[in-house]
Design a protein with these regions (language model features):
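Short loop/turn motifs enriched for small/polar and acidic residues
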Residues: 200-201, 530
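Extended acidic/polar, glycine-enriched regions
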Residues: 189, 196-198, 225, 236
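Short, surface-exposed linear segments at secondary-structure transitions and domain or protein termini
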Residues: 158-163, 204
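C-terminal interaction appendages of subunits in large macromolecular complexes
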Residues: 182-186
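Short Cys/His-rich micro-motifs in 6-15 aa windows
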Residues: 128-131, 188-195
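Nucleic-acid endo/exonuclease domains
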Residues: 203-207, 248
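Extended, well-ordered protein cores
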Residues: 1-155, 166-173, 178, 212-626
Length: 626
């Protein structure tokens, strides 16, 4: 295959396992399964060795919750000529397959199926000179499977057809599917009309319903071309729908991330904890059911000489507790409500405290130094001068974002064979950056939430989302007025910060801390940089969080939220119905509240600026910032 350059971070999203991408030769490729990523026979030139230690990264909380032993950075490509003295980790590539397999001649319309491993552009065997190009139609199902369009079965109206005569594709009139005709040399002809139709609930599609002449439905076979010739056994049985290769719903990556938090106690030095996890001490701790300071000193006296027995015992307790949690998580099926409940509260508490770690530096702003009008809305404002985020690819979905598949099912979609015990992994990237953390005042929030008009307004959106959960099999998500308000606030703040701090909107991300789990109510948001090098970023975002700078930015953002260029329509839709993806927004559109999808953890859903500034259409005084 030709080498197509791609950013390492893009191999997590949007070009992870099972995703389609267009190479520099114009061909469409599908990223291969994780089994092939660090395979010396597939991913490297002959004679090159792979040292995995260079790519392994640790994030203890995310490892525990996802049930893996470590994460791996996508490999970077190193051309042999630039590293002539090196023999390790040279010429590592991410294997891809040419998909879709069906090609069409632009001159004569000849259709021909090619192998997944085809390297060069094929020439038409009828024209001899013209190069064939891939067709633009594929099929997929809601379980994430992907297939070539069934050209032969479609034209013969029979999924069990035995005809192997030559096929061709022609146009008669307009370029819509209705005027594209599939023909077979046996005399069969059929247009592509209605192949992309599907019912609202997804229970039937034009392709599944109309392919066969008989009432028999054409259903998904479970095809997974990213596994190459090692296809999983067993049919899927769901209806399949046709789609264009460049359609946005062909691939939705499922990523999970965690902000680095130090593992420490008042007694155990952080360097000792790290030493126990990366040195031979870790193997000794794992292999022994009984470990104490004296036993560890007996085996490794030089390593532990600088530390006291009390420090060793404290560090041992931290590491052993982590290992037990890791072992119990291996077979865990993650419920994503619990996922957030286990991950976010600890981050929330740490961001409210001063931190001075190499990879987490937090400075608290005295709330008294904030403008008097604004300080009543917030209880904590922190400047996160340095942070590290680990972002892992957990799985993917097609047709609709989100998936009801369990964690283990998602892993099976990316691995043909599960990794051996002790070597389970998922691909991830490390992002260093900076941010601003704001915690809203709990008393003011509770007082605001008590208004019946607010509950009535949010109820419409909650009910609409419940319908989407049922019809699209989404995992349950608890929505509240608090969540919608804080989420919308994060969006307008991101949009305003782009004018002040020098970062584009796509360079900033939100991390919402809004829940009511275990009696602990979270009500905060972290706005942080989504990309940066190993040393972090330049500090422009943190500078905007200082007193005297932050207040004008927030007031400007709220002032702009009062009027949208689509008003009064935007606000009226919020009062009467819904808009945006799956109608899951109220008064929020591209002109006022939406941000790049990579910046929003909810896919630009669950927004309503009326909860910030009130509803002038109905006259309801429901704005939090009155």
């Amino acid at each position: 295959m030709p080498i197509n350059p791609v950013r390492r971070s893009h191999l997590i999203a949007p070009f992870g396992v099972g995703a389609l991408s267009v190479g520099k030769d114009g061909a469409t490729y599908i990223t291969a399964a994780l089994d092939y990523w660090f395979n010396e026979e597939v991913a490297t030139d002959k004679g090159s060795e792979i040292d995995l230690h260079e790519y392994k990264v640790e994030e203890w909380r995310l490892q525990r919750l996802l049930g893996v032993d470590h994460f791996r950075l996508p490999p970077d490509y190193r051309a042999p000529g630039n590293y002539s003295h090196e023999k390790v980790n040279m010429s590592i590539t991410i294997p891809v397959y040419r998909f879709p397999r069906w090609h069409v001649c632009p001159a004569c319309g000849r259709l021909e199926q090619m192998p997944l491993t085809l390297k060069a552009k094929p020439k038409c065997r009828s024209c001899q000179r013209t190069y064939m190009s891939q067709v633009q139609l594929i099929t997929m199902c809601e379980n994430g499977h992907l297939h070539d369009f069934p050209w032969r079965e479609w034209v013969h109206q029979d999924e069990d057809t035995q005809c192997q005569a030559q096929l061709s594709l022609s146009k008669s009139g307009a370029s819509t599917l209705q005027y594209q005709i599939v023909s077979c040399n046996c005399g069969a002809k059929r247009s592509l009309a209605n192949v992309m139709w599907f019912s609202t609930d997804g229970s039937s599609t034009g392709l599944s319903t109309n392919l066969n002449r008989s009432p028999k439905e054409y259903l998904c076979s479970g095809s997974s071309p990213w596994f190459g010739r090692h296809q999983p056994e067993g049919a899927c049985g769901l209806p399949v729908r046709a789609a264009l290769t460049n359609a946005t719903n062909v691939y939705y990556p499922d990523t999970k991330s965690a902000i680095y938090l130090p593992r420490r106690s008042d007694i155990a030095p952080s360097e000792l904890v790290e030493l126990m996890e990366t040195s031979p001490l870790d193997d000794l701790i794992r292999d022994s059911s009984k470990s104490d300071a004296q036993r560890l000193r007996l085996h490794h006296p030089l390593i532990l000489k600088p530390f006291t027995d009390e420090q060793i015992e404290a560090a041992l307790k931290i590491v052993s507790n982590k290992n037990r949690k890791m072992e119990s998580a291996v077979d865990q099926i993650v419920d994503y409500e619990n996922f957030e409940g286990d991950l976010l509260p600890l981050e929330y508490e740490q961001l409210k405290c001063k931190q001075d770690e190499p990879q987490l530096q937090v400075q608290l702003i005295a709330i008294e130094s904030i403008d008097e009008k604004l300080r009543s809305y917030f209880s904590t404002i922190s400047l996160v001068k340095k942070l590290r985020e680990t972002r892992a690819l957990v799985g993917f979905s097609r047709v609709y974002p989100g998936s009801s598949l369990s964690l283990e099912q998602k892993k099976k979609m990316m691995f043909n064979e599960a990794p051996t015990k002790g070597e389970s992994w998922l691909p991830a990237i490390i992002v260093h950056g900076e941010g601003i953390f704001l915690e809203f005042d709990q008393d003011k929030l509770e007082s605001w939430e008590s208004y019946q008009a607010i509950e009535k307004r949010v109820k419409k959106l909650v009910e609409r989302h419940k319908v989407m959960e049922r019809t699209r099999k989404w995992l349950h998500k608890s929505l509240s007025a608090r969540f919608l308000m804080i989420h919308t606030f994060a969006h307008i703040l991101i949009n305003e910060l782009t004018f002040e701090c020098g970062y584009s909107a796509a360079s900033l991300r939100e991390r919402l801390y809004v829940s009511n789990l275990g009696g602990k109510r979270l009500s905060g948001v972290l706005i942080y940089t989504a990309s940066g090098d190993s040393e972090g970023t330049l500090g422009g975002l943190v500078a905007m969080g200082r007193p005297g700078y932050l207040e004008p930015i927030i007031w400007k953002a709220l002032e702009k939220a009062k009027w949208c260029s689509a008003d009064p329509v935007c606000m009226e839709i919020g009062s009467g119905g819904g808009q945006g993806p799956e109608s899951c927004n109220l008064a929020a559109c591209h002109n006022c509240c939406l941000v790049p999808e990579t910046s929003c953890q909810e896919g630009n859903r669950f927004l309503d600026r009326a909860l910030l500034i009130g509803d002038p259409v109905s006259g309801a005084d429901i704005g939090f910032f009155k």
